[in-house]
């Protein structure tokens, strides 16, 4: 069984995705055993799907992806008092799959949010030898409060799928989760190339939208 796109894994699970957003930003969710069990069940299904998943490696701007996700989480969690801070200076490009990496990072951030003992989660992009990676630092332990550890197994499998690595460094007060991916010598499209692509899309879609919906992009 081959899945060409990671989105195939989530076919028919839109309702669960909405619940997961509530799970991510509602600490009281940890007391809802029924929903927690469902979350673990879906993770087990995804772990099985990952064994058969195939995809074409792509060049991923890891620093931009990490920053965007961290900022979004910080905004969404602002009312809870938990802050997500991104630290990263230079761009780093890796070979992998942006959707898989996004899912893995969200899993780590949700662990840090739900089980962290401090109201601060620090996320940074790092460089180690021939790899670039993401480091998530929070107070407390990612594993001591977990009933199954499926989430971390999910992250580990994603890293292995992209020829990367995943490991955890723990002290008495903090947990550091690190995902590493092989560096890419390729560069993503430049800002000028992206602007040209967006302009082309706009020029082609705008007349269609006016004709079909009576609306126009601005």
Tell what function each PLM region has.
Residues 132-150:
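Glycine-rich/acidic phosphate-handling loop/turn and adjacent ATP-lid/helix
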Residues 101-102:
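A residue-level detector for a conserved hydrophobic packing site
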Residues 120-130:
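Short beta-strand/loop element within the Bergerat-fold HATPase_c
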Residues 50-55, 93-96:
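Conserved micro-motifs of the catalytic ATP-binding
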Residues 161-218:
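Flexible, glycine-/charge-rich segments associated with ATP-binding catalytic modules
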Residues 56-71:
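A conserved beta-strand-to-alpha-helix junction within the catalytic ATP-binding
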Residues 111-113:
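Short helix-loop "hinge" at the ATP-lid/N-box region of the Bergerat-fold HATPase_c
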Residues 83-92, 137:
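Conserved catalytic submotifs in the C-terminal HATPase_c
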């Amino acid at each position: 069984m081959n899945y060409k796109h990671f989105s195939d894994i989530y076919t028919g699970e839109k309702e669960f995705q909405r619940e997961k957003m509530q799970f991510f930003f509602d600490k009281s969710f940890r007391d809802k055993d029924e929903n927690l069990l469902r979350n673990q069940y879906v993770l087990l299904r995804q772990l099985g799907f990952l064994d058969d998943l195939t995809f074409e490696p792509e060049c991923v701007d890891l620093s931009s992806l990490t920053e965007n996700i961290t900022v979004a989480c910080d905004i969404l969690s602002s009312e809870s008092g938990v802050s997500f801070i991104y630290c990263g200076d230079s761009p780093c490009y890796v070979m992998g799959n942006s959707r898989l990496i996004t899912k893995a990072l969200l899993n780590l951030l949700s662990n840090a949010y739900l089980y962290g003992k401090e109201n601060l989660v620090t996320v940074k992009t790092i460089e180690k030898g021939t790899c670039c990676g993401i480091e998530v630092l929070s107070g407390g332990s990612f594993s001591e409060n977990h009933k199954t550890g499926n989430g971390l197994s999910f992250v580990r499998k994603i890293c292995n799928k992209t020829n990367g690595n995943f490991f955890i460094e723990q002290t008495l007060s903090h947990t550091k989760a690190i995902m590493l991916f092989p560096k890419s010598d390729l560069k993503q499209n430049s800002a000028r190339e992206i602007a040209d692509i967006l302009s082309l899309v706009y020029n082609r879609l705008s007349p269609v939208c006016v004709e079909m919906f009576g609306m126009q992009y601005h």
